[in-house]
Amino acid sequence: MNESKPGGPPRIALVTGASRGIGRAAAIALAKSGAHVVALARTQGALEELDDEIRALRPTEPEATTLAPMDLRDFAAIDRLGEALYRRWGRLDVFVGNAGVLGLLTPLHHLYPKTWDDVMAVNVTANWRLIRSLDPLLRLSSAGRVAFMTSSAASQAQMRAYWGAYAASKAALDALARAYAAETVNTSNIRVMLINPGALRTRMRATAMPGEDPATLRAPEELSAKIVEICSPDWTETGKLYDFPSDRILSFRAPA
């Protein structure tokens, strides 16, 4: 499904955590679909490698990407980001909130306050600051699309021990995304989705599950086509969860 209409202006897509893993795969897939990708990550070198790969895919378009090296704990920089995007393009069509940190897998009473604060800052507060900064631009799009990467750790019936900080942050992100979907569904063309990628071959997964054979896991590139679909103008669902392992769209329901 094409992200940008042939002959029309490219859709502008911001991807956080774009230097590796799911974010990198999403950035490349969006670029292949014709979008201009604003790639945000902390690591300048990895962003430049991403830029080189996208340039190789679109050799006649030397400016198919814009690199935005940024630490998402720098909230003032997030506040400036929306203004910078508005000055250049006057809108934002796609926001993929992918960046996240695992933190330390340890009992809650052993967790350092700084570790807790870092997990919440990146996984929750940064996404709220991004919504706050980007909402005016998404409303200026004819089809603003937002996709946040969540985790089954937030909603498993049997909560996993030692994952408290990460699970709490993703549960908060779920609520944040659903609230934003409810706020925008009748007042804009914005549609908001949560995506559970499941177990993929990423650095975070390797850190969390060091004994797992990565060859048994699916690659992030397998998810990227669905991210492009969810971020396309044709997508109409909002406030729901796309579960990649089961390939299903799930609605949130209160317990019976």
PLM features per residue range, with description:
Residues 190, 194-195, 202, 210-256:
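C-terminal helical subdomain
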Residues 106-108, 115-117:
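Substrate-binding pocket helix/loop in short-chain dehydrogenase/reductase
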Residues 98-105:
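Conserved NAD(P)H cofactor-binding loop of Rossmann-fold oxidoreductase domains
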Residues 33-49:
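Conserved glycine-rich Rossmann-like NAD(P)H-binding loop of the short-chain dehydrogenase/reductase
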Residues 19-21:
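Conserved glycine-rich cofactor-binding loop
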Residues 45, 69-80, 113:
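The beta1-alpha1 cofactor-binding region of Rossmann-like NAD(H)/NADP(H)-dependent oxidoreductases
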Residues 139, 143-186:
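Catalytic loop of short-chain dehydrogenase/reductase
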